Amino acid sequence: MMDFDERVPVGSNMYLPGCTYYVSGTDFSSLPPFLPQTPSSCPMTYSYSTSSLPQVQSVREVSFRDYAIDTSSKWHSRGNLPHCYATEDMVHRDCLSNPGTLGDMLSKNNSVLYHSNTNHASNMYGNVGRNGVLPQAFDQFFETTYGNVENQPTDHPVDRTASKAPPPAESGSDSCRGTDETERCEETSSPEPSSGNNEEKFSGSSNGQKTRKKRCPYTKYQIRELEREFFFSVYINKEKRLQLSRMLNLTDRQVKIWFQNRRMKEKKLNRDRLQYYTTNPLL
């Protein structure tokens, strides 16, 4: 097919719809030409009147229209085309026919394209709404959709600040958290008597609400010394209790309550051991 196309000259009387070349009539002299250019050579009858129909362009003009060939001297003018297509087609035709002045053409026709597009949009959709794309009839959907989105960022900072707000500081609780050294410092700075791990202290605030004081556990050093003393004697006398309280920087009441709790714990452990051995006779 390529060899046949290369040796056939361009611009003969016969048109092939699959390619842009023309075949001379001498090659096919015995066959009648198809797709004639004159409409009178192929009369056809229609069931409707053709006088009211708009004039249709020929096949040659439609096929060469997209290739930007200057056919003003051969073909009829396209004054009957729609206005929107004629404007855009002329702009693209000028750009393609003058490839060297592409930048100039874009700069010259920028305002023309802008105004023509706005005029076409105004004719098709009427007045454009606040969203810039849809008509004014869609403004109610635009406001309901994007109005909630715009109001959301104003609500989030309030929630974030409320969630990030620190809880009210409790009296004597700052020194109790942290390492063992900070706990020991708290015990030195608060010499008032307390009831150890199980003690609950209530401090009345300005609004009359009672809050529980945070528990201050014993340090490892204090527990080790108390366990050592408990190993020698389950019940501690007053002199030994005062000595331990001064050495461990605790109050007398704290040492006393610790021994009470430790005795209850030891009693529970003994009961659990007894139950374990009685339920397992093999041991």
Swiss-Prot record:
Localization in the cell: Nucleus
UniProt keyword terms in alphabetical order: Developmental protein, DNA-binding, Homeobox, Nucleus, Transcription, Transcription regulation
Main location: nucleus
InterPro entries registered for this protein in UniProt: DUF3528, HD, HD_metazoa, Homeobox_CS, Homeodomain-like_sf
Pfam family, one: Homeodomain
Gene3D superfamilies assigned: Homeodomain-like (1.10.10.60)
Skewed-composition ranges (Low complexity): 188-197
PROSITE patterns: HOMEOBOX_1 (PS00027), HOMEOBOX_2 (PS50071)
GO cellular component terms, A-Z: nucleoplasm
Residue ranges, annotated region (Disordered): 147-215
Single GO molecular function: DNA-binding transcription factor activity, RNA polymerase II-specific
DNA-binding region, residue intervals: 211-270
Family in the record: Belongs to the Abd-B homeobox family.
Protein name (Swiss-Prot/TrEMBL): Homeobox protein Hox-A11b
Gene name per UniProt: hoxa11b
